[in-house]
Structure formats: C-alpha cells, structure tokens
C-alpha cells in the first residue's frame, strides 16, 4: 500500500511527458479542461506530445493567417508591383535577382493572359 501512495505517477501521468513545473501542480490543475466555450485544440500539444512533428507540418501546411484579399486580381497586382518596387530599390544582389525573377514571372503571366484571350476568341 505504501508503494502505491509514494509513487510519483498515477494513471495517465505515467504515459505522458510532464515538466517539473507541471509536476509541482496538483493533479486537477495538470489535466484541467478548458472552460466551456473554449476550444480544445490549443491544448493538443500539452495533451499529446508524441505527434508534434506531424502537427508542426500540418501547421506549416495550413497557416492561421490567410491572404483572401490577394484573390482579387487588382489587389494581387498592386501588392506584386509594390513588392517588385521594393526589391528593385534594394542594394542586395540576392534581392535584385529576386526582382528579375519576379519580372520574368510577370512577363510569363502577361503572355499566358494574351494566349488565353486569343484562345477564347477562337
């Protein structure tokens, strides 16, 4: 009986990675659920530490921020022109090469638009 009482872990604690600060807290605080109305997703890293590499790849593949405004053609062109002007005014050779690559991409995009318009007319 004394062996069970003095054991440093009970139940699921044995299977999970516990930091020293979490170990200093009592059991209810360690595995407390979020309050009602709050999502469980922010607590996944703490609850399931084994699949962190898969979660980090998923976070990289689906970022929390989105650029919905860039789906509009005018906003996309404006941001692209702003980026190109910033790249061309820089002194770095890498940024100058990026500006040249961006210019080639824009030229290819314009050529594809012309071809698409011609195909549409035919």
Curated annotation (Swiss-Prot):
One of its GO terms (cellular component) is extracellular region. NCBIfam families: type_III_YscX. Its main location: secreted. Keywords: Coiled coil, Plasmid, Secreted. InterPro entries: T3SS_YscX. This is Yop proteins translocation protein X. Residues 71-87 form a coiled coil. It comes from Yersinia pestis. The region between residues 50 and 110, which contains the predicted coiled coil domain, is essential for interaction with YscY. May possess both an mRNA signal and a syc-dependent signal capable of directing its export through the type III secretion system. Required for Yop secretion. Interacts with YscY.
């Amino acid at each position: 009986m004394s062996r069970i009482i003095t054991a440093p872990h009970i139940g699921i604690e044995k299977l999970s990675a516990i930091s020293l600060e979490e170990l200093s807290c009592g059991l209810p605080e360690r595995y407390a659920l979020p309050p009602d109305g709050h999502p469980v997703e922010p607590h996944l890293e703490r609850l399931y530490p084994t699949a962190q590499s898969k979660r980090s790849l998923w976070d990289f593949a689906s970022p929390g921020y989105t650029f919905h405004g860039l789906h509009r053609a005018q906003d996309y062109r404006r941001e692209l022109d702003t980026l190109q002007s910033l790249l061309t005014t820089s002194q770095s050779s890498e940024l100058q090469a990026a500006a040249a690559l961006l210019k080639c991409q824009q030229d290819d995009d314009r050529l594809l638009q012309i071809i698409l318009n011609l195909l549409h007319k035919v």
